[in-house]
Swiss-Prot record:
Lineage start: Eukaryota, Viridiplantae, Streptophyta, Embryophyta, Tracheophyta
GO terms for MF: heme binding; iron ion binding; monooxygenase activity; oxidoreductase activity, acting on paired donors, with incorporation or reduction of molecular oxygen
Sequence positions that bind heme: 472
Protein name (Swiss-Prot/TrEMBL): Cytochrome P450 714B1
Presence of the UniProt keyword Cell cycle in the record: no
Cofactor(s) required for function per UniProt: heme
Amino acid sequence: MVVVVAAAMAAASLCCGVAAYLYYVLWLAPERLRAHLRRQGIGGPTPSFPYGNLADMRSHAAAAAGGKATGEGRQEGDIVHDYRQAVFPFYENWRKQYGPVFTYSVGNMVFLHVSRPDIVRELSLCVSLDLGKSSYMKATHQPLFGEGILKSNGNAWAHQRKLIAPEFFPDKVKGMVDLMVDSAQVLVSSWEDRIDRSGGNALDLMIDDDIRAYSADVISRTCFGSSYVKGKQIFDMIRELQKTVSTKKQNLLAEMTGLSFLFPKASGRAAWRLNGRVRALILDLVGENGEEDGGNLLSAMLRSARGGGGGGGEVAAAAEDFVVDNCKNIYFAGYESTAVTAAWCLMLLALHPEWQDRVRDEVQAACCGGGGRSPDFPALQKMKNLTMVIQETLRLYPAGAVVSRQALRELSLGGVRVPRGVNIYVPVSTLHLDAELWGGGAGAAEFDPARFADARPPLHAYLPFGAGARTCLGQTFAMAELKVLLSLVLCRFEVALSPEYVHSPAHKLIVEAEHGVRLVLKKVRSKCDWAGFD
């Protein structure tokens, strides 16, 4: 009897302890953060236990999906570039209700949503390592990014950036342009061959996969010393891993309380299986290049990983993790986002043939002035209209729709005291489409590259490559890659929207065309007979 009573008391004590822990984690701790912000006059929707404002977010999303908040259309007149209400309806509705600074919660995670330029300015100027990436998002995206540069914090992040950044300095990028041209010529020639085989002068096709192949080939050649053929499996699996991570169903309560290991989901297991296969393929690539100094990013990472000395099994495993995680990060950042931006750019040029003609004339003048040579780095720098088109594309369709940070200690931004643990969300699309910030002849939601002709963009309201110390280190590389592709495509083709194109931006870690970008390509005779074409 005594044993039974003792067991019952122990069970009751355990239940009380678990209940107290859950109450603290799910309500008390986040409520303290919310109270800290409320005392500063920062409002927001009222959260409920235990999921915060998640039910409201789902309700707003369902209403937007049912009403098609921005037009999904097949005709040019139906295309609306302001996708905020369709993709992020909860943010837009709350911003209109509570102003440019408000707070909301997802489970026990407290978010400070900021679209006030003065606060964004201070965030951009903050170089403290105590402003990092969200611990929750880091855990959620672990199979895709691991401990690589995109999600790491503190000294680990600083070390990785110091190692990787020099590989994307302008002097390095100059030497990569010829490889980019080679990859672009393969793509353009394949499109010409398909048109010739069709027996006509034009072709209606979905361009997304072909552009991803180009972007993947560029990354493989320039950063890892291999061809796309060799790395195709890695790219395909990373794409599949991205889809799995962005759509996998979370057991939110388990994630919030640190008990997710007790409630594994099938989608989570699938992500980790894919991660294992990606890891094995990358290590095979490392093995092939392990004894070589190719002067590329992979070689630099291998040198850094081996710099720790001999060590035991744990050291070797850590070195492998370092190389694998950063390879995945570079593959994703340099491959997916650039390919999506190129697709959006061609879609916008198809909608605006006057800009297409301007860019084509400019490219031919820049390259044919050098005797018809293929574009090199100096020629790319002369392409001002093309630069403006890319800048405007990145304004309307930034790959990263949100800049997210977590306060790893209490910070002050724009007069707002941000307590430790609060996640700061800056909606890039909101800043990029703000009518007050982007005034002038064309509306903020209209395509007008000329807005970049003479004036600098509004300070701290144009964030296509992120903000602050964590600004994308590969932006010079990405701009060169985009210019090479677009210049070669436009010198060989006129592009128009296909009647089958359906405009529907969607957020899948980055903002991309949900149904792909479908164009009609018509061959034109270029004034520049670049090697590899004729």
